[in-house]
Design a protein with these regions (language model features):
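Structural preference for solvent-exposed beta-strand-turn elements
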Residues: 1-168
Length: 168
């Protein structure tokens, strides 16, 4: 917030002040943080001028938040990349939004289905975003069938002789 021109007074709770509209900024993040990227997008959406975040997080839920902001009138480019560009608008409007499924939750249910040796189908709207996670599960011997709106896991197909994670 301070980089955008807000003044933060360390009280409890924090007192955040600004004289006028926040100013667009170019920011280089030390690492790709979901929270930092989402906060940047929300602030930059109504900041004056343009803002750029380098090393932005690009997870599906970050993209979903940016899509919601777009539906409210925000001008955001670079979704799914490490460079997020936002041109601030004077005001955002209301919108209707459906929050996508959480990939951690979907993966947890798939893991439960896998370790119990059964067959479990998870209905989800994020199947296309689960590819990397499914690849890792397949290394452990799990098998999957996917459709546009579901993932079915079939339990263990091989014995695990040692932990998957190697010593660092």
């Amino acid at each position: 917030l301070e980089q955008f021109g807000a003044r933060i007074v360390a009280t409890h709770p924090y007192d955040i002040r600004r004289e006028d509209r926040l100013k667009g900024q170019e920011i280089w993040a030390d690492y790709a943080s979901v929270t930092a990227t989402e906060t940047f997008a929300m602030i930059a959406a109504t900041a004056e001028d343009s803002s750029v975040l380098m090393n932005a997080a690009s997870e599906p839920h970050v993209q979903a938040l940016c899509e919601m902001l777009r539906s409210m009138g925000a001008k955001i480019d670079g979704l799914g990349t490490s460079r997020l560009s936002v041109t601030g608008v004077e005001r955002l409007s209301g919108t209707r939004v459906r929050v996508p499924d959480d990939h951690h939750e979907v993966a947890t249910f798939l893991a439960i289905g896998g370790v119990t040796g059964g067959r479990l189908t998870v209905k989800t709207d994020i199947t296309p975003h689960m590819t990397l996670i499914l690849r890792q599960f397949e290394k452990l011997g799990l098998q999957f069938e996917t459709t546009d709106d579901s993932i079915t896991v079939t339990g263990w197909t091989r014995e695990i002789s040692r932990p998957y994670t190697r010593e660092m």
